[in-house]
Amino acid sequence: MRVIELLDKPAVRYEVTEHPPAFTAQQMAAAEHEPGKYVAKPVIVKADGKYMMCVLSACYKIDLGALKNQLGAKSVELAEEKEIGEIFDDCELGDGPPFGNLYDLPTIMDKALETDDHITFQAGTHEKAIRMSMDDYRKLVEPKILEFSYHMTS
């Protein structure tokens, strides 16, 4: 898996945990007993026809209008499931890690994640998660920080 290879190279401290199958970021947060604000989910969008990875908290939803305005794009839309499967060719569908740089995608992180001390995300499968420091994540990925999400209400 590309993400483990990347994390092992610079000797980044991280923890891999196993959990019951989780098919959404919110399910993984519950399985990991982790608040949704610390669980990152990558959302692949097409901005003016170019793929980008947006990283936001599990308990937030993407605001495509806000993203479009901040990018200065003419159009922003969610990528199709088939496209996502082709991008994350080394992962189970829906479990790609939030590392756009591993998939030649620009990475944009939501400002709501910026002050978190750590980040947890799917490790490419429905049964494994990776937890690492936010500082290390930001050094490895160098995401652009924008505000493009809103908190989901119950």
Question: Can you annotate each of these PLM segments?
Answer:
Residues 1-154:
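Extended, low-hydrophobicity, polar/charged segments
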